[in-house]
Amino acid sequence: MSQPAQQQEVPGVQSEMTPVPDCGEESYEGSGKLVGKVAVITGGDSGIGRAVAIAFAREGADVLISYLSEDSDAKDTQGWVERAGRRSVLMRGDVADPQHCRDIIQTAVDELGGVDILVSNAAFQMSHDSLEEISDDEWDRTIHTNISAMFHLCKAAIPHMKAGSSIIGSSSVNSDMPSPQLAPYAATKAAIANFCASLAQLLGEKGIRVNSVAPGPIWTPLIPATMPPEKVQHFGENTPLGRAGQPKELAPVYVLLASDDGSFVSGARVAVTGGRPVL
């Protein structure tokens, strides 16, 4: 099972992908697990972020959707949240900017009433065959977007989070099985898993749980926007299940970690990889 070869400009637009990723728009059914909660999701416009936003809304949460510049994708996701009967706020901007991270949290507090769930999901990657191809600016952008942003978001959010709140970092199978072509990205994803494990210990006394999710190859706009077309065509074929995952297949894990169903789950890294081991 594969996708046609295709290429987009960074950051990628979901509506222009073939096939369009399945984020659970027509399939996810909630059962009230997050009623009364406020969630902040970075990279919430498309892919995994959209699937999580839809699932959270159908479980009863209001959602702030942070995104870089993909206005049409973000508005589509907002529409799905609002059709679930929940409030939604869009925040356009770059999480590589520490002040923007602080503004995201303050906006959630001001417009939605607080922060109960923080999902640090926005990510940047590029594929290279040699270290010499990676510019200093690209290295810095990857670090700032993927791991520094999580630090700034958490630092701003924690004072507003009550006992029972949840922080979730989107790590990757690359945290354990790093792709040599994605060296900067893989390093940041390992850092996210490690940072979440540290935070779980720091915040346990406050009753705040912290976990990370390690997706395998998931069909999102990041793929055609950052990989050469020939790699896109065969993306996901090397998993034991023989295919890339769909964003909707991640959403139930985020719901578990955000809800009382996961009330004793903290410090974990949950692998959703199609069979590729994360030990």
Which role does the model predict for each range below?
Residues D129-L131, S135-D140, F235:
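Substrate-binding pocket helix/loop in short-chain dehydrogenase/reductase
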Residues T239-L250:
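A conserved structural motif in NAD(P)-dependent oxidoreductases
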Residues S172:
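Residue(s) in the substrate-gating loop at a strand-loop-helix junction
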Residues C154, T188, C196:
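Active-site helix of classical SDR
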Residues M17, D22-E26, H128, M177, ...:
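Short C-terminal tail/terminal secondary-structure segment
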Residues D71, R92-I105, D136, K248-E249:
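The beta1-alpha1 cofactor-binding region of Rossmann-like NAD(H)/NADP(H)-dependent oxidoreductases
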Residues G204, R209, V265-G267:
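Short, small/polar-rich loop/turn modules that mediate ligand/substrate recognition or access, typified
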